[in-house]
Amino acid sequence: METKKKDKRVLINVLNIFFSILAIVVFMLYTRVEFLHMKELGLEYEKIYNINLKEKIYIMSITFVITFIYILCVNLFLKKDFKKLFKQENKEMPKINLFTPALLIGVLNSIVANFVFRGKILNLLHTAKFGKTVGILGLDYSFSLLISPIIQLLLFYITVFVILTIGYAFIYYILVVNFKLDGIDNNDFIKGNFVKLFRRLGIFLAYLTLIIYVLRTFDIYSGDMLKKQQPDNTYLTGAGLGDVTIKLWGRVILIFYFLITIIRLNKDIKKQEGIKVVKKVISIPVLLLSLQVILLLFNNVIIRQNRLEKENKFIEKNIKATEEAFNIKLDTKVISEAQELVKKDIIEAQEVIETVPIISKNIAKQNLESFKKKDSPYKYMNTSVINTEEGTKYFTSREINDTKKRTIEDKTYVFNHGIFGALTDSAHVDEDGFILFDEKMNNDKFTLGNKVIKQPRIYYGLNTNKTTVVGKDILEYDYEITSKETKEKEIFTNKYDGKSGLKLGKFDAFLLSLTKLDFNIFNEGQNKDNKVLFNREIIKRVKTVIPDITYDDKPYIVPNEKGGLTWVIDGYTWTSYYPYSQRIQIRDENGNLRRINYLKNSIKVLVDAYDGTVQFYILDETDPFAKQIQNKYPNIFKTEKDMPNIIKENLLYPRKLYDVQARIVENYHKIGADTLYRSEDIWEISSVKNENNKIIDTRYLNIKLENEEKPKLSLLTMYTPFSKQNINGYLIGSIVNGKNKLTLYKFDQNESLLSLNLMRDKIHEDEKAKIELDKISRMGTEVVRDTMLVPISTSILYVEPVYQIHLNENSVPVLKMVIVANGSKVGIGSSLKDAVSNLFSDTAININIYDPNDMNFLLEKIINGNKNLKESLNSKNWKYIGKDVDKLTKLIDELEKAKAKDDMRKNRENIDKIQSNRENENHELKVKKEKENTINSIFDRIFKPEDSNARK
């Protein structure tokens, strides 16, 4: 029997040692793979690996030691209880292995802790200051945004671990008591060490919860502050009067109460005073609920009468913080009145009109797919826009299609890179309406953005997921040319001579082939003349270096100074807890919905498409989130000044940032606290849906800004007042001197420039326009319409290209017509030039742009203005009384003007109706007279006596 027990102990010890060694080996192998990934990126990134490795060792070793000692103490604590129980039953206590559970749990916990806290401890040690303070303690924003979340995560992790420990101890205790003993008496159980352990850990958890509650107090400043008035009804973010008085100081009082309660609770439990314990536990949720009730009464009763005045400074904080957090630095231009375009405006804007993208990116890509050969080894990826000497072009990168069914050998050695791409003219088509594009596949000169491309190959891209082996003896598929005469294919090959890739030894080759599940790496990767290229998908590649940054999922290609291709990836920093900044809902890089209130494009990453070289640039050194990463990894980042000029010249305003900023500007466009709270000047983005019921994306247009010699590629968004259809402003996002710039144009008055949706509907309701559109709507075809608004002078030109696509296998989009409109005039032509010419000719179609909702819109604003004035009068707020009277007077003046114009329109319609009736009457009289003359003529021929001379 003793021998069996001894053998069992030996087996347990052997297994213990085995699993410990296995854990160490797995850790070392995993670490080696990480090292290979960093080594492949370059020498400077090995420093990042070393920094991360130190952090990992610290996290895992400290976690292991603490966990091991902690579990060992728990086991020893329980063992004392077991000794007592076995002694009471006169049984020999079996030997309990204290070290094995402690060792295994220690190893497991250290691995989990590494994954949870990886990178976060470094963040904690390299915090950057915001230079702004918040709260009664006057702490820098960095505490609540950078430090507190990590501390809370640590406390939450400890809390979960302690709860699991209690579960572990309980199961351990129950198993021993039920399987080794004959149960346990209740009194013995209550007086036993397990209950003591449970009590101590419970009190410890209470203290942890209290600390988390203290830290969560800072979240008050990024909570829901107060609800805006109709029609918006959204909550402003921040801390209002009730929050900084009742809620904040109420929490401070509760914190001290909870601290005293926990101390006294511990004493009451020791004394086994159950009633007191229950009372103290129940008092906590009761007090929390009471605080919420008091806050509700304060907000809805005490300050309801004069809420705007009392909340004014907090709303102003919200406005300021929102503009800071989303980098909304608006250069605002006011256009006194929108004017209809004249020929002079068109002539002066010729440079802009010639580059209007009548071809969308989707149409351009669809066209390329139509012409692509079925057996093509390539796949078209991202389409981006770039200015060239010939005009604005779309560049669609052409990468290897690694999803095609090929042998593993072909994927590893032969089909491993893409080559250049296709350039599509965005503003012109040929005389038959076919899209103009240039798809180079040979050794001709490749040109992109006025730069000759000497190295057009793409080894690192968006679809380069496979690991590949390259070398001087390995011939890779490059491109093929089919002879026009013989129809035979000539295949050209390439040998990679870039600096990227690793020469691997047997061990590293085996390890990498194991992780990539590709044993060709092991077979050929260890050849001294070969190199292994891996981690080639560019988003994953940059995440390998710095995963803290959120990367744009739509990078674009630009030419570099060496005559190669470079990917530009926009990097973003964000948070949901920036004090007072307004929250907005977006989709993150994984497609999940998030509510954020801070977003900056502070980082750009350049990745060489040929050799995979990665370079990080920090563009906004005032962003503490970016500065924290820079502090963590010194010498990795370069500044905007270090960026090559050719890259700067081709940078685009980040669409993801712009789309968020455009939504923020709907409410935050240089307005006051009263306007924001009362929702008096809410805008809506003027968007339109395509045939698939999807909103058409914002697009890059060439727009000429003030004080700029040439038009710049810019993003454009049009706005209408909430629930109204007239354009009242537009936002331009452009790159000026290498920096993002937002320019907002506001119309003081505009009745002739309609939103995209309304203008589209008005045009398509017109009979003449319908006839033209019906001509191309045939059976077996699909009509695709695209729409955009182009700012010209003090007006806006509506442009709608119309494509016809035959519903067959090779469906090529063909431009059939272009519709343009401005004010009440519509021009239709086979091209943009013809359509603009017809807009100012006799063939122009006149449409009715009157919107019957205009009067109702003004009446609603007057009613709301009167309501606001009454509130100001009741609260005797003279500041807002004056403002409200001025606003109401202005609205009444606008109503009078609108009424006068409406009366003129009605009079004109009546006059036109009278003239039309008269014309109809005259026409009827004329027809009647002609009929009478015809009848008389026939009668005369039949019955009038014949002339005597005629008879003769």
Residues of each region from the PLM?
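Soluble extracytoplasmic regions of secretory-pathway and membrane proteins
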Residues: 3-875, 879-923, 938-942
